[in-house]
Amino acid sequence: MTPNEQYSGGLPPLVPSAPAIDPWNWPPDSGWSPQRNLIGYHVKATDGNVGKIDMATHAQDASYLVVDARRWIFGSTLVVPAGLVSVIDHSEQNVYLICTKELVKSAPPLKPVDGKFTNRPDRDKLARYYRAALSR
């Protein structure tokens, strides 16, 4: 079953309760700064490693991480909205998420347009997915 089939067939996997998120903006207390390069940092969900950051954006209402998850999901690159970041540990080069690996893995895919993940309908679908999952 594909991630889209899983999502369209019901709610995503349950995760611990989390505050409402603004998916496409960095949380103000996350430790994010446009002066810091996050490429190569490890991304960690609440239950383990997701992958390494290949790209991080900081555009208003369009911030996200592109994560190389090939060691975990064969051949996969994932887009993780910046609003899922709880904290960034610059000394250890780790980015911690507010959700589980399964939630990230089951998310609807976001396809690049001209090398950027800015397709509005896909972004809206991804935002709805995470809001629904994290508000339960």
Give the ranges of each region predicted by the language model.
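Peripheral interaction segments used for macromolecular assembly
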Residues: 1-136
